[in-house]
A protein has these predicted regions:
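Walker A/P-loop nucleotide-binding motif
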Residues: 23-42
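N-terminal pre-P-loop "Q-motif" helix
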Residues: 3-17
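Conserved AAA+ ATPase "SRH/arginine-finger" region at the nucleotide-binding site
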Residues: 197-208
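Amphipathic alpha-helical "lid/sensor" segments that cap RecA-like P-loop NTPase cores
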Residues: 197, 215, 219-255
Length: 255
């Protein structure tokens, strides 16, 4: 499990969302590299109880774009649980879409082929697929949390779709939640602006938070004064503080 010096506010807000104690169901996490976004996404997954389906997607690896997201969600939740979506895919495939064997490799390949058409036809097909996909999600008996990491690494089309279409669909279904993290984050649209909360991860300068972290990870070789020096040296940037602590701990073990 990833240990944190201090992300109490974000974790508490996430738990409130899942319990229905706040109105928001969309959480945007913005921070530069090294501030612990990815580790926080993993912690969000752990906080999901057995009554909630978490779906983690790293958007920087989604080179197939929208097709990858559809396919990834299906793989995590179970392809058979999307009967309407699968039927719509079959209808498109049986309507004359040309499929070459060497193109049917990788996640989302069939969906990619279906969407590999001129813009107007692509828009129509995507609308049809999106509609039945979210209709299938409405039939799930448990809430679903989509955890989308590295939004800044998404293709331009995928980022725009998440911002304008995906999150709008999430807003319509009270059993759906979405966490989107990145160095940049989606801009709220009228469909979901009243259902989102934005968190900007800051540097962690709180001494007590780092003292607790050092104790949790077993770095008993540091005094509080030494920890203070390391925090100030890198101005509380979490990844850099951790790197200094780990490096100093290894050096002391070798002495």
């Amino acid at each position: 499990m990833t240990r944190f010096a201090n992300r109490t506010r974000e974790l508490h807000l996430f738990e409130q969302m899942l319990r229905g104690q706040v109105r928001e169901r969309i959480l945007l996490i913005e921070a530069p590299s090294g501030y612990g976004k990815t580790g926080l996404m993993g912690r969000f997954e752990i906080l999901c109880s057995q009554k909630i389906h978490p779906v983690l997607i790293d958007l920087k690896g989604a080179q197939a774009g929208i097709a990858f997201v559809f396919s990834r969600i299906q793989r995590v939740l179970g392809k058979k649980r999307f009967p309407n979506f699968n039927a719509q895919i079959d209808r498109f495939l049986n309507s004359g879409v040309e499929i070459q064997n060497n193109r049917l490799t990788g996640e989302g390949s069939q969906i990619q082929v279906i969407l590999d058409v001129p813009p107007e036809e692509r828009k129509y097909r995507l609308t049809q697929l999106q509609q039945v996909f979210f209709e299938d999600l409405e039939r799930f008996d448990r809430p679903i949390v989509f955890i989308l990491d590295t939004y800044n690494g998404a293709t331009e089309e995928l980022a725009g779709w998440i911002e304008s279409q995906f999150l709008a669909e999430v807003a319509l279904n009270p059993k759906l939640f979405a966490i989107v993290a990145g160095q940049i984050i989606p801009q709220p649209t009228i469909e979901w602006q009243n259902l989102h909360h934005r968190c900007k991860l800051d540097r962690i300068m709180e001494r007590e938070a780092w003292y607790g972290y050092v104790k949790d990870v077993g770095f008993d070789c540091f005094s509080s004064q030494e920890i203070d020096v390391l925090i100030d040296a890198v101005e509380g940037v979490p990844a850099r503080v951790v790197a200094l602590l780990e490096g100093a701990a290894r050096t002391r073990q070798q002495i």
